C-alpha cells in the first residue's frame, strides 16, 4: 500500500453543521453551509425552515441567508458565478439550482433534475473539459439503487440544462454517501463516505475515466475519525466544549475541499452519524 496523503486536522469550528464546502470567490475564501431545521435543527437557527449561508473565512463574517426551504446544498464557483445545487427535501424527487454573482442577490431556484420515483439527497458539481458534471445521490427506486445510497451523473454545457449520462453510476453494490466529485484530466476522482454503524464511517476515494468503470484507491480510507477531531478551533462556551469532549465519534464524512494559498483547504463532519455531529477543518499540501 502506498503512503497515506498527509491530511492535518485543524479542529472543530461548529456544532450541528454537516453539509458544508469551501469555495474561493473573487480571491476570497468562503465556507458554504447548510443550516438544518427539524429534528436536528441547528442551535442558532431562529426561523422555522432550513436555509443556506456563506461564511467569509478570514473574519468569520456571516453573509445573508438564502435558499430558504431547500436542503443538502453544495456550492460551486465558475468565473463570476456561485452556483448552488440542492434537493427539495431529504428523500424528495426534485433537484434545484440557484446562483449569484455578488453573494447577496440570488436567482429563483429552478428545477434541474426530477423523477417521481427518486429519493434525492446530496449533490456535487465539477468542471470537466468543456462540460460540467453533476453527481446526485439517490436512495430509491430499488431498480436503480441496489444498496442505498447510489450516485448518478448528469452533464451540462451551459450550467442551465442538465441531461442524465446514461449507464453511469457509482456505489450500487455498497453503501456510499456525501459525494465530492473532481476532475483532473483524464480522471474523475470521487470522494465518498463508506462504512457502517458497527465498524465506523470513513472517507474513501475512487477514480474513473468514463464514470462507468471505477478503480478504488490503494490509499483508502483517506480520512478516519480520531482524537484530533476534537481540537478546539473556535471560542466555544463551556457547555459546547463539554459536548465536543463527550461526543461519540465513529465518523468522518462529507469531506470537501478547494485550493487556497498553495494548500488544500478542507471541511468535514465528525460525530455519531445519528444527529450529534460537528463541523471541522483540515489541510493538506497540493500534490
Language-model features, listed with the residues they occupy:
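Carbohydrate-active catalytic/glycan-binding domains of CAZyme proteins
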Residues: 1-287
Amino acid at each position: 500500500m502506498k503512503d497515506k496523503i498527509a491530511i492535518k486536522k485543524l479542529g472543530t469550528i461548529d456544532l450541528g453543521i454537516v453539509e458544508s464546502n469551501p469555495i474561493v470567490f473573487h480571491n476570497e475564501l468562503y465556507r458554504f453551509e447548510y443550516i438544518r431545521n427539524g429534528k436536528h435543527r441547528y442551535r442558532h437557527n431562529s426561523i422555522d425552515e432550513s436555509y443556506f449561508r456563506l461564511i467569509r473565512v478570514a473574519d468569520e463574517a456571516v453573509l445573508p441567508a438564502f435558499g430558504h426551504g431547500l436542503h443538502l446544498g453544495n456550492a460551486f464557483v465558475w468565473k463570476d458565478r456561485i452556483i448552488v445545487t440542492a434537493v427539495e427535501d431529504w428523500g424528495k424527487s426534485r433537484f434545484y439550482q440557484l446562483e449569484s454573482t455578488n453573494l447577496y442577490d440570488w436567482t429563483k431556484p429552478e428545477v434541474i433534475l426530477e423523477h417521481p420515483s427518486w429519493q434525492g439527497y446530496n449533490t456535487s458539481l465539477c468542471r470537466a473539459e468543456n462540460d460540467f458534471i453533476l453527481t446526485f445521490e439517490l436512495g430509491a427506486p430499488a431498480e436503480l439503487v441496489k444498496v442505498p445510497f447510489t450516485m448518478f451523473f448528469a452533464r451540462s454545457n451551459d450550467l442551465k440544462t442538465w441531461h442524465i449520462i446514461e449507464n453511469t453510476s457509482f456505489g450500487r453494490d455498497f453503501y456510499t454517501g456525501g459525494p465530492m466529485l473532481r476532475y483532473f484530466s483524464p480522471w474523475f476522482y470521487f470522494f465518498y463516505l463508506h462504512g457502517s454503524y458497527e465498524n465506523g464511517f470513513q472517507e474513501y476515494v475512487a477514480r474513473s475515466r468514463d464514470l462507468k468503470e471505477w478503480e478504488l484507491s490503494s490509499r483508502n480510507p483517506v480520512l478516519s475519525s480520531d482524537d484530533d477531531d476534537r481540537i478546539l478551533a473556535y471560542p466555544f462556551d463551556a457547555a459546547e466544549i463539554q459536548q465536543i469532549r463527550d461526543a461519540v465519534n465513529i465518523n468522518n464524512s462529507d469531506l470537501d475541499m478547494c485550493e487556497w494559498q498553495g494548500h488544500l483547504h478542507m471541511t468535514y463532519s465528525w460525530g455519531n452519524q445519528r444527529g450529534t455531529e460537528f463541523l471541522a477543518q483540515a489541510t493538506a499540501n497540493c500534490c
